[in-house]
Amino acid sequence: RETAQGVTESYEVERDVLLDMLFHEVKENVEVIFNDSISSLEQSAEEVTVTFTSGKRRSFSLLLGCDGTHSVVRKICFGEESSFSLFMQNYFGLSIVDKLLIAEDTGQMFNVPGKTVMLNAYNNKTDIAFCFFSEEEIAYDQRDLNQQMDMIRQHFEREGWRISELLEEMARCNNFYFDKLCQIRMDSWSKGRVALVGDAAYCPSPAAGMGGSMAILGAAALADALRKYPNDFKLAFQEYDRSFRPITEQIQANAIEFGMELVMPRTEEAIQRRNAQFGTVER
């Protein structure tokens, strides 16, 4: 809900906690396969047959790809990621440390033009996020964490504030994640008996702060559509697109128009403009 000052109040649930909650709800009724993924698929009029990386083959009525921004299901069924990825000219590195670097339940942000550091403290943990502007996409090894950390260091090591301390914390953590800031935009979220949900279909980027929420809302929209058309998956997929696409397009547009200026201003003027807006908000 919104407060009198227009600030939206919400509850934030840690990713691991949310996953445990969801798994607890479905574990008695859903077969869950760990440590395996799809390597290929074949569709017929009656079913989808998939081959797993383990070599096993299984057939299903429908295949729903909920496997994130770099979706394997999307690549196999729809084509290369580059056809659907909108690069937002920023890269980010995220680390989570098991201690408080600022007061609990608070956040801090450091900005210079084209560079942002954000701290978010909760439950005796602190998220450390580094983000930097890049006009072009950067070629790097997605498996080489040291190379990715070096890119963060090269962009931030000469900055002041607490940067040296935070870079050391980043180097010591065992959960570092690095990626480009991007959105996934597709003309269609389904092909035959395959449909995509969440970031795989309509990632809004971290600038939106809505990835998890959109995945849950999208799953609910798809479930509603399948319930509405239980005997016709084609109509169900069309209904899913019709009902949920306006929401995804609005959130993605807001991330571009407002989220980037809020979190990653590129000029000193943009930083001052953002700070002035913060100054008018009462907490």
Region roles according to the model:
Residues 1-94, 137-150, 182:
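Conserved N-terminal helical subregion
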Residues 40, 116-118, 186:
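Short, surface-exposed charged micro-motifs
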Residues 64-65, 93, 151, 171-257, ...:
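Conserved mid-domain beta->alpha element of the FAD-binding
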Residues 71, 92-94, 114-118, 201-202:
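Histidine-centered metal-chelating micro-motifs
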Residues 99-105, 137-138, 162, 187, ...:
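Short helix-loop capping/hinge motifs at secondary-structure junctions, enriched
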Residues 106-138, 149, 153-158:
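Active-site substrate-recognition segment that forms the wall
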Residues 141-175, 241-242, 246:
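Flavin-binding catalytic cores
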Residues 258-282:
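C-terminal domain-closing interface element
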